[in-house]
């Protein structure tokens, strides 16, 4: 059941949040150029989570996930072992199958924990956001992120756990961590 849910939510993210609907039918990590034509420079997952723009998470994100779930009924995800294809240019990172799969998995996590994300948004202040974002400079300084958050937040304990998991289990595993291609 857990595997089905993982595939289902990967399909959900495939269809909507990332705008990569053609990936749903891809049989390998060799994605054709047309898949990426017209793709926004930053996906929602990148904009709000990877860059820690927590206070800008849209209020209707739950509604967006509900719509994505409906769309996912017509999409079968193809989970493949994507090899690394590190792209030095930020614009070309979507040609790296491992990065695309990372974003899909991160989107699954975010969609599966929306209540915690919204709780985090409710206690995040502009000052806290600025403090944690100061720890991102071509790479994540994981200890700085955790320290800045722990020193400057008024968030409930469950939100603290969510932020720590997001940083330790997701941001720390960004395939573009430290490559210089992980920021606009």
Swiss-Prot record:
Disulfide feature: 29-34, 65-111, 75-82, 123-155, 135-144
Predominant subcellular localization, coarse grouping: secreted
Tissue: Highly expressed in atrium. Moderately expressed in the pericardium, pulmonary vein, nephridium, arteria anterior, ovotestis and connective tissue. Low expression found in intestine, lung plexus, diaphragm, subesophageal ganglion, ventricle and digestive gland. Very low expression found in columellar retractor, pedal nerves and cerebral ganglion. Not expressed in hemocytes.
The keyword Disulfide bond appears for this protein: yes
Modifications made to the protein after synthesis: N-glycosylated.
Keyword Disulfide bond: yes
A single cellular component GO annotation: extracellular region
Keywords: Disulfide bond, Glycoprotein, Secreted, Signal
Residues carrying covalently attached carbohydrate according to the record: 74
Extent of the signal sequence: 1-26
Superkingdom, natural source: Eukaryota
Subcellular location: Secreted
Protein name from the UniProt record: Cysteine-rich atrial secretory protein
Species, as recorded: Achatina achatina
Gene label: crasp
